[in-house]
Amino acid sequence: TDDARLVYRVIQEGQAAGGTAINYAKVVGLLRNKPGKVIGIQVRDVLTGAEKEIKAGLVINASGAWADELRGMIDKPARLRLLRGSHLIFSHERVPLDDAVSFLHAQDHRPVFAFSWEGATLVGTTDIDHDHPMSTDPWISEQEVDYLLSAVNHIFDCLHLTRDDVISTFAGIRSVLDTGKADPSKEARDEIL
């Protein structure tokens, strides 16, 4: 799935149904009526610093990994555990996969996958706690590179892949409900409304 394209499509559908989409805006506060019901948001244009109130009949917190920031604005406790998933990208010539494969990492028996993606081969993913500020883009750590290289070299031992074979990396943050499990991979991937 091209997640950027999916998000754009959801935005288009929302606009077609009468919604308004704004970009480069951060929610900095919630608007409330006298009884305390949330009736809108205060947003800041992150490019200009200008702020604006936007009123709404219904405010939905669909902010993913940032959801606890908004929950804090209504005095609700944090519920999320932020996990980073990182990936390595190899040239298709170096890792010539035409089909998707999934296997268990020899070290910890976590699932790892590899598949053809955008003319290259993608290998992932890690599953570690993300303890960095959400205001910065996530990045893959040296340990994650080693972890994924170890996995792919174990399964495709004839390739002898090194860091020099990695043409790109990327990482993303996924939020899961924090149940206090020691192993991030054991947290449930459930959604709640």
Predicted regions and their residues:
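General beta-strand structural signal in soluble alpha/beta enzymes
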Residues: 21-23, 61, 123
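Short, hydrophobic/aromatic-rich segments at coil-to-beta transitions
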Residues: 37-41, 98-99
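A conserved short coil-to-beta-strand element within the FAD-binding core of flavoproteins
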Residues: 23-39
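Core beta-strand elements of the Rossmann-like FAD/NAD(P) dinucleotide-binding domain
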Residues: 47-58, 62
